[in-house]
């Protein structure tokens, strides 16, 4: 097998298109143990996600975890599954469709979406953009805060997918948008709207996905970017520091992770007499297992069970128009001159094609 793939013949005078690929983490195709096993195997085999030496980790993963965890995880997914499928896939697809609608008048832009793990695969969607004539691709990892285990993993996967292409596209990545004014503004608006309907809580808890503490110690900026997001959001809401709490959820294994942990924090608040807490997850732009099941179900039960009176979960941004506006602005800013340059006219393209054919070009 050839190391580099054979490309379609280059056609002179063709339109140069820009591809925009939104990439989120991933989801199984069904809430079943059979579907969870390959998904978890791909996810937990990524050395960006689990930094334990392969010789130690892979036997544990394949011999123990993949024989026990899929069934437990399937039950959790089943509790949030919708008629349209996984909430994360549904929201990510809708976000891509809404961004595509913003560029509907342009023949030189294509918008699509993929998942880092599971389907639709990054490789398949990059191939589709190539087939559509995209010679420039902006990859948008849908993680507001950069982490090596999320954003960098998307970058790794794109590089892996392109290693066999002969005719490579221009590439750009959105590294993070944790302090983007539009993103912060949309978060603040979602909180204000919730409080207009339900009143204000005693505490607002912002729960971010956790990471092992050693990632912070080894220079990962994720922890700092989470706290910057929280500070900017609290300032936008005009909240005193004592009313805002930052915590980290989804701890896995026995290693020390970023602290404080979300569920124990909620239980402690209830025991200390905090009657109502509102929880939001600014690190997720789409509702998913970690928000709908872990926070809105498990953590709700833990808080109320510890003596809390009222628990409110404020949904992720999902398809909020102000968030889609912010995402569009970010895409346009990161794509830059790809979208602002004046494309050649039909006459100019035909002239270029004519010159190439006169010099002996086949297409």
Swiss-Prot record:
It is an enzyme of class 4 (lyase). Pathway: Porphyrin-containing compound metabolism; protoheme biosynthesis; protoheme from protoporphyrin-IX: step 1/1. Its EC number is 4.98.1.1. InterPro entries: Ferrochelatase, Ferrochelatase_AS, Ferrochelatase_C, Ferrochelatase_N. The keyword Iron applies. Signal peptide: none annotated. It catalyses: heme b + 2 H(+) = protoporphyrin IX + Fe(2+). GO terms for cellular component: cytoplasm. Keywords: Cytoplasm, Heme biosynthesis, Iron, Lyase, Metal-binding, Porphyrin biosynthesis. SUPFAM superfamilies: Chelatase (SSF53800). It comes from the Bacteria. Fe cation binds at residues 209, 290. It is found in: Cytoplasm. One of its GO terms (biological process) is heme biosynthetic process. GO terms for molecular function: ferrochelatase activity; metal ion binding. Catalyzes the ferrous insertion into protoporphyrin IX. Belongs to the ferrochelatase family. NCBIfam families: hemH. HAMAP family: Ferrochelatase (MF_00323). This is Ferrochelatase. It comes from Azoarcus sp. (strain BH72).
